[in-house]
């Protein structure tokens, strides 16, 4: 494939992604939690907009406060890793526990590993 064709294709997708971001942002601002998660993901990845972890966290918090368990899980992971926020393993586990309690399957799968990591950290500090 010709390089100029690839550039045109990449430009096409970049424009579509930016439009998708703007449309999703309008719906997120209306308080629709599913779009709040999409906007948060796009900020986190820099898809259709500039990457901004703090804005991603803001939108995950909004979606979580609006009852979206995926956002609650992603907030927990962010706090656990210190991704866009100060690392707080306990707070991360709290969010993931809440998402697991609300039936989010990925949270149920991730939670034991997070708790094991926390226990490992405690043991290492004792040494």
Language-model features and meaning:
Residues 87-105, 112:
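TPR/TPR-like (Sel1-like) alpha-helical repeat modules
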Residues 38-45, 74-81, 113-117:
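Hydrophobic face of amphipathic alpha-helices that form TPR/SEL1-like repeat modules
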